């Protein structure tokens, strides 16, 4: 299920020419277009070193139906690995050049880290079973192009590196060129992120068999609650994975969050491993 990258770029680049709702602004606490990563990055704050959220930031206590001990068999604690783990995601972005191709554009970088921590495994010194490091460099446009009741908010094109930072035989990594499109319609948000794998994938040559060539994300705001779903799927092989989430505000800055992941590819070490994981915890920022 490959696609023409050049054709996709040719389709997307003209979008930046449409009238823009989000442009470079000097703000203090005024919210950007809700749900728009690019509109948020275009806002200038008093502190020039302000970091912005990219993906969601959360901390969960989780339990999985099955643990991939075979993939970590070279770890001296593998046989004692537990099914309950603390899972957290840290995801931040920083604008490098606002207005690089007009007031609605930004050149930016992001860093996302996901970890699976055997916190309760005190007999083995509470090791981190897996951590994935995902830096990106991207060009983003905030738009207000409307079609069929939907408003295209974000157009983003960039380079993504994803690695677990391990050496052989547990090393996993891949590099991708990607495009991210996000549109809103009332309380609905839909985001699609197709990618094209570049470079070597010797540590995981069949990763697209399980992870496919895109990620689809859907969000719905129900009162103060946010319902979310995202996943990736390879239509040729029938493999994929999906994540469901619900968050609700506890305080102004913290949300209660519960998450279920089922399928392949929850982490890089588990890209070809099928499991179901349930987690409960807190979140700092959701889709909206």
Where are these regions (language model features)?
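Outer-membrane beta-barrel "beta-signal"
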Residues: 274-288
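Intrinsically disordered, low-complexity linker/tail regions enriched in polar/charged residues
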Residues: 20-24, 163, 198-200, 228, ...
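Outer-membrane pore/translocation modules
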Residues: 65-75, 82, 97-220, 231, ...
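Membrane-embedded beta-strand positions in outer-membrane beta-barrel channels/transporters
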Residues: 85, 89-91, 134-136, 178, ...
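Conserved, mostly hydrophobic/aromatic
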Residues: 92, 258
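A subset of solvent-exposed loop/turn segments in beta-rich extracellular surface proteins, enriched
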Residues: 22-73, 129-131
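Cleavable N-terminal export/targeting peptides
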Residues: 1-42, 288
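Glycine/small-residue-rich hydrophobic helix-like segments
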Residues: 224-254
């Amino acid at each position: 299920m490959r696609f023409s990258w050049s054709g996709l770029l040719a389709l997307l680049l003209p979008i930046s020419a449409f009238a823009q709702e989000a442009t470079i602004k000097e703000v203090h606490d005024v919210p950007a277009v809700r749900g728009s990563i690019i509109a948020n990055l275009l806002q200038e704050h008093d502190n020039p070193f302000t970091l912005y959220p990219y993906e969601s930031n959360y901390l969960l206590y989780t339990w999985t139906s099955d643990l991939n001990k075979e993939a970590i068999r070279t770890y001296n604690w593998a046989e004692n690995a537990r099914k309950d783990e603390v899972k957290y995601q840290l995801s931040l972005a920083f604008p490098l050049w606002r207005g690089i191709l007009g007031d609605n554009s930004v050149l930016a970088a992001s860093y996302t880290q996901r970890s699976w921590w055997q916190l309760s495994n005190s007999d083995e010194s509470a090791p981190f079973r897996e951590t994935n490091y995902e830096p990106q460099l991207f060009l983003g446009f905030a738009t207000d192009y409307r079609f069929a009741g939907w408003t295209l908010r974000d157009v983003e094109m960039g380079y993504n590196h994803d690695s677990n930072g391990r050496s052989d035989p547990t090393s996993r990594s891949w590099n991708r060129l990607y495009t991210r499109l996000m549109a809103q319609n009332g309380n609905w948000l839909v985001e699609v992120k197709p990618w094209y794998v570049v470079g070597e994938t010797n540590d995981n040559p069949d990763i697209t068999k399980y992870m496919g060539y895109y990620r689809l994300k859907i969000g719905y705001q129900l009162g103060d609650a946010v319902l979310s779903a995202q996943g990736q799927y390879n239509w040729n092989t029938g493999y994929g994975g999906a994540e469901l989430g619900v968050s609700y505000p506890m305080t102004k800055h913290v949300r209660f969050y519960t998450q279920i992941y089922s399928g392949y590819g929850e982490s890089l070490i588990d890209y070809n491993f099928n499991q179901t994981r349930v987690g409960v915890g807190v979140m700092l920022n959701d889709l909206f």
